[in-house]
Amino acid sequence: MGDPAAHEMADLERGFSSEDDAEYRSGDDEASKFVENEPSKRGKISQKKKIEQTNFAKWMDTNQKSLTRKAVKQSVNQDNSLAYMIRSWEGGEKIITSPRDYQMELFERAKQQNTIAVLDTGSGKTLIAALLLDHTVNQELEDRAKGLPRRIAFFLVEKVALAFQQHAVLECNLAHSVAVFSGESIKNTWTKGFWETQLADHEVIVCTAEILNQCLQYAYIRIDQINLLVFDEAHHTKKNHPYARIIKDYYASGKDRGLRLPRIFGMTASPVDALIDVRQAAIELEGLLHSRIATTADPDALRRAVGRPKKEIIYKYNPLVKPIQTMLTFKLRPLIANNKQFSKAFAFSEAAARELGTWFVDRMWQLFLEDEELLKLEAKTERSLSKDMAAPEVVEKHRNAVRSARELIRSHEFPKPEPGLLSSKLKTLSKLLEEYFTDSSIRCIVFVERRWTAKLLTDFFESHAAEIPGLKVGSLMGANAEGGSSQTSFREQIRTILSFKKGNTNCIFATSVAEEGLDIPDCNLIIRFDICKTMIQYIQSRGRARQADSTYIHLIEGGNGDHRRIMHQNAENEKLLRRFCNTQPEDRLLKGSDYDMDFFLRQERNQRQYTIKSTGARLTYKNSLPILQAFLNTLRNQDDYAEGMDLVADYSILSVQGGFICEVMMPPLSPVTSAIGKVYSTKQVAKCSAAFELCFQLIQKKFLDDHLRSKFVEKRHVMANARLAVSSKNKAKYDMRLKPQIWAELGVPEKLYATVLILSKPSALERPSRPLFILTRTPLPQLKPFLLFLGPVEQEMTSDLVCQVLNCPITPTEEDLQLLTKFTLKIFVDIFNKKYAANAQALPYFFAPTNKDHVFLFSNLQDPRNAVDWPLLRHVADRDAEAYTGDEPEEFFQDKYIVDPHDGARRFWLQGIRKDLTCTSPVPADVEHQPTHRQWKRREVPHDILHWSLTAWKATREAHENKWKENQPVVVGKYATLRRNFLADINETSKNPFCYFVLEPMRISPLPVDVVAMAYLLPSIIHRIEQNLIALDACRLLQLDIHPDLALEALTKDSDNQGEDERMDSIQAFEPVNFQPGMGANYERLELLGDSFLKMATTIAVFTLIPNKDEFDYHCERMVMICNQNLFGVAKSDDLKLHEYIRSKSFERGTWYPVLKLEFGKTHLKTLKQMDEHRLADKSIADVCEALIGAAYMTTRKHDDYDLAVRAVTRLVNHKQHPMTKWDDYHAAYVMPGWQTMPANAAELDMAQKIHEATGYQFKHPRVLRSAFRHPSRPYVFDKVPHYQRLEFLGDALFDMACVDYLFHIAPDEGPQWLTEHKMAMVSNQFLGCLAVSLGFHKFILHHHASIGSQIHEYVTEITEARRAAEDAAEAAGKPRSAYSRDYWVEAPQPPKCIPDVLEAYVGAIFVDSKYDYSVVQQFFHAHVLPFFASMRMYDTFANKHPVTFFTQYVFETFGCHAYGLHAEEMPVKDDTGLVTGKTQVVAGILLHGQVVEGAVRDSGRYAKIAAARKALDKLRSMTRQEFLDAYKCDCKPGEAAEDISESATAI
């Protein structure tokens, strides 16, 4: 049927001509130029983008199969894999399958007895030593608590460099004080008091063995004050070596005297380091160290686990020639040969001439006798001779000889390195390097015997690197007390190793320092330039090549029998070592938990079984291990899997009362993280029991099907793969509310509540004005002042509009209501040409004039009635217009408001009389506003002032044709603006406002001009008030008392693509589409804040209500609540219909009027019909939910009251896992677990105290802190607390909230993109790792994984070096070192994940320990995080490291190309792809000149774009400029910009 009123209007429009409906106009037709809501037009697609879209679509179609295929597929199907594993399980004796297996066994053995670990290089002996040290110190703390004397542990090394190396590793991995000493560092502090202080201050001391030997010798330390002795490279224990002296002189004698002796733990790759019998050496080593050897039954098997070279090659070089003395050496010999400082140099010159070539001898002298070095040698010569009591003339003679040598060097002409001056050995090395360094991935170590050889080879290849492209050399030598330019410090060694790790150096020339001890990143090429003299050298240097495709090369001299003998002897000795290991007694073998599994399973009767009734499939102890391994293999099919991830189960077996117990720990991708088996008498059965328990959990949780095969591909958590995202492209039409509920409360008002409308800057209005009252039946909320644009902004013609709500109501009489009604209706008719048929019962609000000015303090009013201008109300009520005869005095014609009763668009401000004009005078030429009726346009009437003043209908004009007073004065007026929207800065079309007319056809309004001036602002004011009230209606539905301005901000969407941009993933900056000004702040900032609070609130809820699930389940439970799909569904529900309250359209001149019966004036039914619906994306509706949560948070934040935000979360997620209605409900629901309340042991108390000293927070429950630092690799049975992942999950959300809240408040004018980019810096793993290290958290991480320890050490070294460099830079700039730039971490590498993880877990731990007191999180944030972010400007470019942004920079800077594009589309689903899981897959592609470079598929556009950009970067990095130009036909010119660069990215 349609709307009857609409039909009526259509009839009226057909009945009138355009000239006859002028009186119904309200200026809206002529004001069309001020309308901001122009329909958005589809942007023109450029030719470039069309090509890109076409090519991208073709590429997607071509590559769809490969895109949807999993990154890694199993080579065999699951059935075959399982069958194969079972067959392999049943046959043959099992050996150690995992390094963790033997490490834990060795650790347990070392706790019980003195042990020498004989294991290959790289097998994790240092990890075991660290575990043993941690265990020993923890036990020591318990002993002290019982009153036993204090003892300390010593970690002994053979070389000074190793002391600093091992100290760095232990300091990073132990939560106790670790000191390091070398003879040089303490030579001036060697006193009893000094050592007493060290024993009191530290728990572990790392030093060279001689230091401890002397301490024991001088009785500074007694043997019974030591609880653990660790001997690194224990094979040195022989004869009078300090290792042997410590044992013989102090340990053995202490044993005879019954002293409390330390545990001994020795580490070595071989019990021998010389050409002696292995068995005899082993017996002697065990005897000397009072220990038993622990080794593996099959060393080869262990090497397969820890890595060893794939290829071992012997290269022969031609026989070396007899050394020839060079001319320079000949000349130097008589000068300095007798000087002891040069004896080693002359000896090396002979070896260098033969081994390297004569060119190197002269180069050695050139480097050795540099000016700086010679000055040192001269001084040393003088000191040496002085000690020998040499005569002064002898000293002077030697000094002059050194100076003569320096002059000789300066004048010598050094030859170029011609082939004839180089040895065959050097040429062979050069050829090898040239051959291998065609591959950019090569990392090479060249082992040499002498320090000077390393120095000279580095110098040679550094100077001639251009001859071998890609070769970047460095040297690594031990610290040497002697002078000379080859001296290196430990810090320089670390820098070299870091450079090697980063790839800045890819070839190191190293002495034996790189063989033993120093932790060098795995390389893939080892070259023995000088042959291994002993088997242990061979084993240790070979252990440096651990990558799967590595190569080990021996250089031997052709025809050299000694070389062949040494090679043969080393090989035979290794065979003997293997045979020795195989023949060790049972108590010395590490066999692991798989050894002879079948035998032990047959012996054990008490085994559990589980049968699945539907299929008869049976889970047993025997098949649980292969079933579990098959399940692990299927984890490769998951999206989170990355190449190189370790998909193995770690079994930790401990000795307990009654036998052994095993805990199996799964990799992070597994939905079940761990299980503990039952106690059995053998390790083998205990291990099977743990595997059985974990498989049983997988069956119960439906991850194994009825045939015991993995269902992980299809099912994880019940909602893990659910379609939880909503599209920003999926839009629909929805109703939109135009009027608030408060206006529907009609009837005769008993009380009226006054809100006064005040201009903060009334001078911004071009004429005087006075405040107005708006009177309502219900009090209006106190709104925040909002800006009105009253004129040009550049002229500062803006003012805030203050809505001052008065508390005391008015009780109106019937007369009062009549006066107010007439005044209100008069404003509508005279100013806005709307005559309504309404009484006081029908009006939603009333206007009233005040008798005060804008500066009056209305808040002091006791009774608002006293501020109402009642005389004016009566004046307006008594007349429709002011009387006019034409004979009034001249002052009458000032400051009047003139209404044209026949044309609603014509209103004038009366300015005075124009005495030189009459009503018959022609309209002056400067009048720009002309009548619009047809007769005027057709010049059917005279263009004089009288007819300009007449706009009545034709019949009316003709009826009065000769009745107008000809002598009435012509007045001057200013055309009143048609503008209604003062909420936006709109540039009005400038026309001359002055006009000349007569008053007889017009009406003089009884409204004073100062009232009218203010009333002109009512459309904007009423619109904004209504928007606030509608927003509050939404909050009322949600039962949330949100501040009105925050409520409106949360519901405001001011552009078509608001909330739809992938801010951090688009190549270009975000630009709003169809932006609508004047709406105030939009929801995006509050959405970001609300998103963080929503994440935090739901995280706390699931952590509290589901204590027995793991992090994976937590993520799924939280995801279901916070996902856009859930928020969208709740918002659209019938009891909310939140979409109706979203404000998506700016001011429109027809919608502010009250809904009343219109008697006269233009209706807006058509406009209202357009405005009562809007198109919204699903995501926009979900975003508004988050923004409302942010608004609720902000409403009460200043009082530290989060109850309102908690209620908002509960209402908007509508989920059983978040029933809380106030903050205290979280902790009220928390049930403290038993492990938390157990008494803390001494180690836990010690840890809590140290953390308190570092952070300032004192734990009430130290075991919660312990949990925060327990890595998943550490078995549960060690600490009896959960690992840190649950607390990390909690802390991540808490920390994120603290960061967003901080940024939100320090940058009130910054948009969501700025907030997001700077939050990225604060929550990045890079920063969290840096912060954790600065607090010393890395030392407390409790892990049982060798690679984690080394990763921590590497990262701590790098971040410490970065900080030191920042301090150096501050000092160089003349600042204190403490004034270093706090962004030093930005360029540091990514930390091992466990470091930022424990920091987040710590945040979660303090929250739990403090009974859910969020203020402790804020205190931690302010105390420890903010110092790094005192200035956010230094992080403005942090987001530029984003892969997409970095790609564009790289392409432009490297190749000068700017014709790039980024496209993303949802992947078309074909066949069954994506249907099982219901996932939405998005494919993104990076394009250059319309050609797809690389693409990737992920679950969201964000991650697809990141992955595509990274792949594209990897591809382009290997290309030369010419290859790039050829491949992509690039013709970009420098300095030129792409024409349509803003369209280079799609929004998915």
UniProtKB/Swiss-Prot annotation:
Cofactors, names only: Mg(2+); Mn(2+)
Methyltransferase in keyword set: no
Binding site for ATP: 119-126
InterPro entries: Dicer_dimer_sf, Dicer_dimerisation_dom, DSRM_2, Helicase/UvrB_N, Helicase_ATP-bd, Helicase_C-like, P-loop_NTPase, PAZ_dom
GO terms assigned for molecular function: ATP binding; DNA binding; helicase activity; metal ion binding; ribonuclease III activity; RNA binding
UniProt binding sites for Mg(2+): 1288, 1397, 1400
Coiled coil: none
Occurrences of domain PAZ (ranges): 871-1006
GO biological process entries: defense response to virus; regulation of defense response to virus; siRNA processing
Domain Dicer dsRNA-binding fold, residue spans: 624-718
UniProt site positions, description: Important for activity: 1393
Segments forming domain Helicase ATP-binding: 106-289
The Helicase C-terminal domain, residue ranges: 428-589
EC number: 3.1.26.-, 3.6.4.-
RNase III domain segment(s): 1051-1197, 1248-1411
Ranges annotated as biased composition (Basic and acidic residues): 1-41
Location of the motif DEAH box: 232-235
Family label: Belongs to the helicase family. Dicer subfamily.
Protein name: Dicer-like protein 1
